[in-house]
Amino acid sequence: MPKPFDLTLYLVTDPRLVAARGLLTTVDAAVKGGATIVQLRDPDAHGRALVEQARALKALLAPLGIPLIINDRVDVAVAADADGVHLGQDDMTPADARAVLGPQRILGLSVGNPAEYAASDLSGVDYLGVGPVKATGTKADAGGAIGAAGVGAVRALTRLPLVGIGGLATADVADVIRAGADGVAVVSSICAASDPEQAARALKAAVLAAR
């Protein structure tokens, strides 16, 4: 079994949005503001560069007890000793990923709607990322927005922990949590914020207030 993890405020990094401030500076500020789990997502980075980024983030986050998740790349997660991997629908199957990762690492899966959930291989999956809740500009291949109601529809089908993701701002958090999400995953609301620490603090407060 993976170690316990907290999905309250799930930060997904975007290399373009953190370029000016720096990846480590942005993530450090977000964690100080209350981010509870961090996913490294950089689809354009080559393997070696991604491993280096992951190791730097692991060194930052491990002493704080914050899990580091790697988007898509099981090999990078193993090489950097990250805490887990998040898979999309077109990535390696969860069963194959689990076979490589072993039982201790966290495994997440993206789900776009109830039909996609029903068709998914959930072997070894520990949590779901459900969305996009709203239209998003940070992921070109994201499907159509499903709204908080879509999150609720997936929640009705599963007991797995889940986060709502996709275009979420602080004002959207309450609806997503009340629909049954355990937390929210955000990209630009923190990565593009002028003050990532304060942005994270406001988002986390909104999650806790809606529970």
UniProtKB/Swiss-Prot annotation:
Binding site for Mg(2+): 72, 91
GO MF annotation, one: magnesium ion binding
Keyword line: Magnesium, Metal-binding, Thiamine biosynthesis, Transferase
Source superkingdom: Bacteria
BP-aspect Gene Ontology terms: thiamine biosynthetic process; thiamine diphosphate biosynthetic process
Residue positions binding 2-[(2R,5Z)-2-carboxy-4-methylthiazol-5(2H)-ylidene]ethyl phosphate: 136-138, 167, 187-188
Listed EC numbers: 2.5.1.3
Cofactor note: Binds 1 Mg(2+) ion per subunit.
Stored InterPro entries: Aldolase_TIM, ThiamineP_synth_sf, ThiamineP_synth_TenI, TMP_synthase
Pathway(s) per entry: Cofactor biosynthesis; thiamine diphosphate biosynthesis; thiamine phosphate from 4-amino-2-methyl-5-diphosphomethylpyrimidine and 4-methyl-5-(2-phosphoethyl)-thiazole: step 1/1
Binding site for 4-amino-2-methyl-5-(diphosphooxymethyl)pyrimidine: 39-41, 71, 110, 139
Cofactors required: Mg(2+)
Any one annotated GO CC term: cytoplasm
Record field: catalytic activity: 2-[(2R,5Z)-2-carboxy-4-methylthiazol-5(2H)-ylidene]ethyl phosphate + 4-amino-2-methyl-5-(diphosphooxymethyl)pyrimidine + 2 H(+) = thiamine phosphate + CO2 + diphosphate; 2-(2-carboxy-4-methylthiazol-5-yl)ethyl phosphate + 4-amino-2-methyl-5-(diphosphooxymethyl)pyrimidine + 2 H(+) = thiamine phosphate + CO2 + diphosphate; 4-methyl-5-(2-phosphooxyethyl)-thiazole + 4-amino-2-methyl-5-(diphosphooxymethyl)pyrimidine + H(+) = thiamine phosphate + diphosphate
UniProt function note: Condenses 4-methyl-5-(beta-hydroxyethyl)thiazole monophosphate (THZ-P) and 2-methyl-4-amino-5-hydroxymethyl pyrimidine pyrophosphate (HMP-PP) to form thiamine monophosphate (TMP).
Family: Belongs to the thiamine-phosphate synthase family.
Entry-linked PANTHER family: THIAMINE-PHOSPHATE PYROPHOSPHORYLASE, THIAMINE-PHOSPHATE SYNTHASE
Protein name: Thiamine-phosphate synthase
Organism: Xanthobacter autotrophicus (strain ATCC BAA-1158 / Py2)
Protein encoded by which gene: thiE
